[in-house]
Amino acid sequence: MTEALARSATASREAEELATRPKIVGASVKRTEDPRLLTGRGAYVDDRKVPGVLHVAFRRSDHSHALIKSIDCSAARKADGVVAVFTAEDMAEVNAVFATSRMKNYYATPITGLATEKVRYVGEPVVGVIAQSRYLAEDALELLDIAYEPLAVVIDPEEAAKPSSALLHEEAGTNVLCSREFKTGDAEAAIASAAVRVSERFRFHRKTPTAMENRTYLAEYEPGRDELTLYTSSQVPGIIRDALSDALDMPGSQLRVIAPDVGGGFGGKASLYPEEIFVAFAARRLGRAVKWTSDRMEDLAATSQGFDQIVDAELALDAEGNAVALKAEVIGDVGAYSIYPWTAVIEPVQVVSFLPGPYKIANYLGRVRGVATSKPPTGPYRGVGRPTSTFVTERLMDMAAQRLGKDPVALRLRNMIQPGEFPHRIGSGIIWDQCAFTECLNAACEKVDYQNLRARQAEARAAGRWFGIGVACYAELTGIGSRISVAPGMPINTGTETAKITVVSTGAVTAAFGVTAMGQGLETTLAQVVAEHLGGRVKDIRVIQGDSAAVPNATGSYASRSAVLAGGAATLAAKEVKEKMIRAASHLLETGPEDLVVEDGKVSVVGTDRALTFRQLARAVYLEMGRIPADKREELASTKTYDPVFGTSATAAHIAVVEIDPDTYEIKLERFVVAEDCGRL
C-alpha cells in the first residue's frame, strides 16, 4: 500500500512538473549538431585518417547472369603497390549470411563477400584488390582475367516467375523467393456482384537511393586482441555487428561497429552489403586497416534499389459509392538476392499490407510474389511499400469517383474510417490505433477553399484550360513495436530500442542510443527528451549514437522509428535516473521526495532556496564517501528498452492545384497543401 501511494505521488508530481515548467520537447531550440556540421567539422568515415591504411577496389561483374569459369589474378598480384588480391575461394572460412524468415513460401539466398561460382547481376563484386592506394588498386583491376559462361538473363519478373524460366538460384527450384496472401471476407464474390468496378495495371519502376555520401567502410584490426572495429556509413551499426559476428565467427565482444556522421541514407544504407563483409575479412586476414569508398557509379549500381512492382488492382463499390471490396495481385521484382536482414519480403509484402489505406473495405484479397531477377537486390527505400500502395488506392478512388459522377473528396470521406471507429483493423490485419483521416482531409479542403476551387476548375475547363486538382490521403505505420516486427519472422527484432543514461561523477549526463543520425537532428531531439524527463538542460546532455558498443542491443534508424523508439527508451531511462537522484537528494537535503523538484540541472526543495546541482549531487554519490549510507547509495544510471508493441499511425491529406499550358505543356504548381496529424508539437 505504501509503495502504491509513493508511486501515485511520484506520478502526480511528475505530471505537475511537466504541466508547469517550460516546455523542452517541442520547443524551438538550436540544433546541437549544427555548429560542427555547418562549419565543415563533421566526422564521416572517409574523414578518418589511419596511418598505413590499405585501399580496396572491386572488379565487378559485367554480366547479368553467368558462370565464373576461371579467374587469373597472377598479373594483378604483381602490380605496383598491390598487397593482396582475394576471390571467393580465399574467403572460404567466411560464413554466408542469410536473411531468414519463418514466413511460409520464402527462400533465403546466401550473402557473401564476393560472388561464388556465378554472378547474378551487373555490378556484383567478384574480386577484391587491396593496394597502398585506391589508384593502384584500380590500375590492378585491369590486369585481372576473368572467364565467364553467359547464362540466360532473367529480367522480366512475370517471365521469371514461370516454371520454365532460367533460375538465379538453382537450389531454390524457383525464382519466386516469397509469396503470401491476405484475405478478409470474400472479395471475389463481392466484386462479381458490385454495381461499380474499376481496375488498372500499375507499373512502378526502380529507384536508387542516392545519398550525398556514398557507402564507405573502414575496418581496423588489433591482432593482439583479435578485435575488429568497422567504421561504416550505415544506418544500422548494431545489425551489421551481429551479422559480421556470424560471418567471421567472432564474438560480439571483439567486434565493434561505429557509424559516425552519416551523409544521408534513405534506406539504402540500412542493409548488410558484400563490401562490408569483405572489408572486415580483409582487415583481419592482413592485420591492417582496410578501407573502401564507393564511387558514384558503384553506388548507383550496387546499392539496394526499390519500388520495382507490378500491381493489378480492382476496387468495387455499390451504387451509392460505398467501397465493398478490393483485390490486388502484386509482383515485386526483388533483384538477385534476398537482402539482409529485411528479406525479399520487405517491399512487395508491405505494398499488399497497406493497400486498404484509410478506408473501410469489408472484403479484401491481396496476393503477392517476390521474384528474383538479374538485377541488384531491392531493399528499404523511403516509405517501403507505402508510396506504391497509396498511389494505387488513391488512383482507384479517383477512377471510382469519375465513374460514379461523385466528387473525389466526398467519395473519400464517405469511405474513410471515422473518428469513433478506432482502433480499426484493415483487411490485411494492420491496426490503425488512432488516426485523423477525416480531420486531415477536411482541414486541407478548408485551407484551399475546396468548393470554390472546384468552381474555378469548371470555369477553366470551359475556357479550354487544363486545370487539375489532385487529392490523396494516406496512412503509415511508424515506430513499430515487437508485435508487428516479428510478423515476417526476420532474424532480428526491429520493434525495440535501448537507451543508456548515466550521470557521471562530474554531474555530466551522457545518453547512449543504438540509433544513427543521418541529418534528421536526432542528437538534438533525444537531448530534449532526456532533458525534459530528467530535469536537465539540453546543452548539458551528451548524446552518443551509432555505436554498437554503446548499448547492449541496437538496430538503428529506419522506418520512421528513431524518435519514437529511442525517445521512448530515453523517457523510461531518464525517469529512473531522476528517481534515483531524488532519493539521494532527499537524504542529503533531509526532506521528503515529495518536496523535491528536478529542473534546469539541479534538485531543489520546493518553496526554498535549498538545492543541489547535478555536479554536487553526483560528487556526493560517487566521491564523498559517508554522505550517503552504502546501503542507500545508487549508481545514477539506467538502461531501458522501449517496446511500443504495435506502433503508431501517421496520417495526412494532400491537395495539389496544377495547371498545364495546352500549347507549351508548361506545368505550373499553383498550390500544394498538406494537412498532417503530427502528434505532439
Where are the predicted features?
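Flexible, low-hydrophobicity surface segments
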Residues: 1-173, 177, 197, 285, ...
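Intrinsic disorder at enzyme termini
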Residues: 1-41, 428, 438-462, 478, ...
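Glycine-rich loop/linker segments at domain edges
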Residues: 27, 33-36, 101-104, 109, ...
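Alpha-helical support elements that line or immediately flank enzyme active sites
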Residues: 58-92, 127-148, 217-286, 341-354, ...
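Phosphate/diphosphate-binding loops
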Residues: 125, 132-133, 287-335, 451, ...
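Accessory "access/gating" subregions that flank catalytic or transport cores
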Residues: 191-198, 203-208, 413-502
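Beta-strand segments within the central parallel beta-sheet cores of soluble alpha/beta enzyme folds
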Residues: 254-260, 287-297, 324-329, 361, ...
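Internal maturation/activation junctions in enzymes
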Residues: 593, 602, 607-650
